[in-house]
Amino acid sequence: MATNFFIQPITEEAETYYPPSVITNKRQDLGVDVYCCSDLVLQPGLNIVRLHIKVACEHRGKKCGFKIMARSSMCTHERLLILANSIGLIDPGYVGELMLKIINLGDTPVQIWAKECLVQLVAQGDHVPDHINILKRNQIFPLFAPTPRGEGRFGSTGEAGIMRT
């Protein structure tokens, strides 16, 4: 079976950039580009960026985690932007909106335009996705059903993970 991403816009704004469709990864790209859904100004220092989407990934029919990684366009001669945690690791049980912590290392604000891609999604195990499935905004979808992990963001479990006693 295949590796597939499922992207669901959660705002009307995001629907503009993510119309319902199934995209076949003919080029066999490892990363799936993710759009910014609105114009943003990133101030020097730490910024929280909403992506206005939920994302799930499955490999061989089983839900799996994925990584959020910077694209090369994130850091250029004109702008010095990095992900605060280098790589965002998304648990298989997370069903909330994707958000980014981006640090603007420069001294001046940086303009980001809607439909600009700063990050990409990479399946756990670095499996090449076969399909990217864009769902309707209010579509009920089993991979987004409530889980014990839930919608809490940025390490919100407050626990040390599976090694707790």
From Swiss-Prot:
Compartment(s) of residence: Host cytoplasm; Virion
Swiss-Prot/TrEMBL cofactor(s): Mg(2+)
Oligomer status and interactors: Homotrimer.
Protein name as annotated: Deoxyuridine 5'-triphosphate nucleotidohydrolase
Regulation: induction: Expressed in the early phase of the viral replicative cycle.
UniProt source species: African swine fever virus (isolate Pig/Kenya/KEN-50/1950) (ASFV)
Recorded family membership: Belongs to the dUTPase family.
CDD domains assigned: trimeric_dUTPase
The enzyme's E.C. designation: 3.6.1.23
Pfam families, per the entry: dUTPase
Organism superkingdom: Viruses
InterPro entries per record: dUTPase-like, dUTPase-like_sf, dUTPase_trimeric
A Gene Ontology BP annotation from the UniProt entry: nucleotide metabolic process
Function per UniProt: The viral dUTPase may play a role in lowering the dUTP concentration in natural infections to minimize misincorporation of deoxyuridine into the viral DNA and ensure the fidelity of genome replication.
Entry GO MF terms: dUTP diphosphatase activity; metal ion binding
Cross-referenced SUPFAM superfamilies: dUTPase-like
Catalytic activity entry: dUTP + H2O = dUMP + diphosphate + H(+)
One Gene Ontology CC term in the entry: host cell cytoplasm
UniProtKB keywords: Host cytoplasm, Hydrolase, Magnesium, Metal-binding, Nucleotide metabolism, Virion
